[in-house]
Amino acid sequence: MTVLSTDIPAPNSPSISDVEAYYDAMGPFYKLIWGDSVHGGYWPAGLEDMSLPEAQEHLTNLMIEKTPIKPGQHMLDLGCGTGLPAIRMASAKQCHVHGLTVAHGQVAEAQATIQAMQMQELVHINWGNAMELPFEADFFNAAWAFESIFHMPSRLTVLQEANRVLQAGSYFVLTDIVEVKSLSPEQQQIFFPAFQINTLTTKQGYLDLFAQTGFEQLELIDLTAGIEKTLAHTKLGIEQKRAELAAIYPPEMLGMIEQTWPMVEKIYAEFVRYVLIVARKRG
């Protein structure tokens, strides 16, 4: 099997412990600026006046809409964060959702939210590595990777593991950031740490990955135009809540966040796209 060059981590790519450290450090930032959901918002045409929390829920609802699953069946959420999308999925479809994250702090927060919302019968969040899934083959009826797969050292391994635990014909729905123009090493040094990105691939790269891992791509939706306002909302939040951020972060780190974010916006606008991909396990 040929491994795609875009799936080979760079020598200094983040490890699992680095991803956990990132969320330990940035968790308070996202909580303050983004709220309870650790993912972007989606403002489709005609709904540009939504608040950030409303846009985040709209994106989650789109993921739910694109994921066929029946009541009582089992879904896997790879990189589930603090668990709110998993809870919303379980509530909407009355299915069991099993979420994994490499951040112990997110596990604790997710489990507390599950208890508070009385969803413990349907939603189960634990620590786990998406490249070494602790589940039997052919167990799940659907899977997600919602703004998480770019953290992982190998998309190929993640897709191989997802294919192993999914039943034939089951859907795998993911969101990812893909390159449309190659980032320079200097741009990577700015953009990758901002989101703890391990590697980026391309739209064609996904077709190649699916061909190698037993999936067929059914749909690729470019959501970039509706996602970009997340960056503007984040920049505004940093400005409006600077005092609260200054109480959390030392001056050096806060200064780095303020300096980096405008550069991240420029790179995002020209070099990458945000996509939602619907794939299905062959067979």
From Swiss-Prot:
Domain of life the protein comes from: Bacteria
Keyword vocabulary terms for this entry: Methyltransferase, S-adenosyl-L-methionine, Transferase
Binding residues annotated for S-adenosyl-L-methionine, in chain numbering: Q106, N129, A130, H151
Reactions catalysed, as given in the entry: (+)-kolavelool + S-adenosyl-L-methionine = (+)-O-methylkolavelool + S-adenosyl-L-homocysteine + H(+)
SUPFAM superfamilies hit by this protein: S-adenosyl-L-methionine-dependent methyltransferases (SSF53335)
GO MF annotation terms: methyltransferase activity
Coiled-coil region(s): none
InterPro entries: Erg6_SMT_methyltransf (IPR050447), SAM-dependent_MTases_sf (IPR029063)
Protein's GO biological process: methylation
Group of enzyme by EC: transferase
Keyword Lipoprotein: no
Gene3D superfamilies: Vaccinia Virus protein VP39
Documented EC number(s): 2.1.1.347
Alphabetized Pfam families for the sequence: CMAS
Protein family per UniProt: Belongs to the methyltransferase superfamily.
Role, per record: Involved in the biosynthesis of the diterpene (+)-O-methylkolavelool. Catalyzes the transfer of a methyl group from S-adenosyl-L-methionine to the hydroxy group of (+)-kolavelool, forming (+)-O-methylkolavelool.
UniProt xrefs under PANTHER family: GERANYL DIPHOSPHATE 2-C-METHYLTRANSFERASE (PTHR44068:SF11), ZGC:194242 (PTHR44068)
Official protein name in the record: (+)-O-methylkolavelool synthase
Species: Herpetosiphon aurantiacus (strain ATCC 23779 / DSM 785 / 114-95)
Lineage, broadest ranks: Bacteria, Bacillati, Chloroflexota, Chloroflexia, Herpetosiphonales
